[in-house]
């Protein structure tokens, strides 16, 4: 995923932004250091691409028990108010968001990363393949990215 900011704290402090392929690199860190890396990405704005009618319908079908129930990341993405259930409040928030209106729920359009951060102790070699998974609250149809 491009344009993700990775904040590094610990024995050094810096940040980098992923390139168009989602790659990133921290350079010139002191050997043997202890670090925490935390990814963040600016939330979508109401009406922007990424959340649309298909997402609202997916959440509504889950709520009404029509078809295959949502699970995993899709279920998390549909539960925009984070109350552990997908209901009318979530569906309306997703609808309002893709129409360009405030959803009234702060999570709608925000990114969530897994893991939320990574901690490294005594780093003496390059740490490769340190990927994060991401979802966007409200993006029920295609919530995962790497």
Roles of regions detected by a PLM:
Residues 1-146:
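Cellulosome-associated attachment modules in secreted, modular CAZymes
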